[in-house]
Amino acid sequence: MTITQQTKIRIKLKAYNSIILNTSCDKILDTASRTNAVAVGPIPLPTKRRIYCVLRSPHVDKDSREHFEIRSHRRIIDIHQPSSQTIDALMKLNLPSGVDIEVKL
């Protein structure tokens, strides 16, 4: 498998917990640096907030409500000039289950 010099790998990471997301980014950057690839990032993207409004009372009292929110943290990592060793190392990398990963070549 030959990869030209102009290719790059873009990795998008999403998680509800920012600490797990940052440790996953560190693992990816460490793997890229061990295989002599040039890594740019992690670039933080805006955090998405989803707010849910729920009535506290099961019957009446419409004025009493609770608000719950879910924050979705996102990061982007670009890897320039990846080798086949870099791709193999990224495929074998174990990341936590709370992190959603999207890889584009």
From Swiss-Prot:
Q: What is its main location?
A: plastid
| Molecular functions (GO terms) | structural constituent of ribosome; tRNA binding
| Pfam families, alphabetized | Ribosomal_S10
Q: Which biological process terms from the Gene Ontology are attached to this UniProt entry?
A: translation
- SMART domains tied to this protein: Ribosomal_S10
Q: Which InterPro entries match?
A: Ribosomal_uS10, Ribosomal_uS10_CS, Ribosomal_uS10_dom, Ribosomal_uS10_dom_sf
- Could you list this entry's UniProt keywords, alphabetically sorted: Chloroplast, Plastid, Ribonucleoprotein, Ribosomal protein
* Taxonomy, superkingdom: Eukaryota
Gene Ontology CC annotation, any one: ribosome
Cell compartments where the protein resides: Plastid, Chloroplast
The family assignment reads: Belongs to the universal ribosomal protein uS10 family.
Q: Which PANTHER family match?
A: 30S RIBOSOMAL PROTEIN S10 FAMILY MEMBER
Subunit annotation? Part of the 30S ribosomal subunit.
Spell out the HAMAP family in the cross-references.
Ribosomal_uS10
Function, in words:
Involved in the binding of tRNA to the ribosomes.
Q: What name goes with this protein?
A: Small ribosomal subunit protein uS10c
Q: What is the lineage of its organism?
A: Eukaryota, Rhodophyta, Bangiophyceae, Bangiales, Bangiaceae
Question: Which gene carries the instructions for this protein?
Answer: rps10
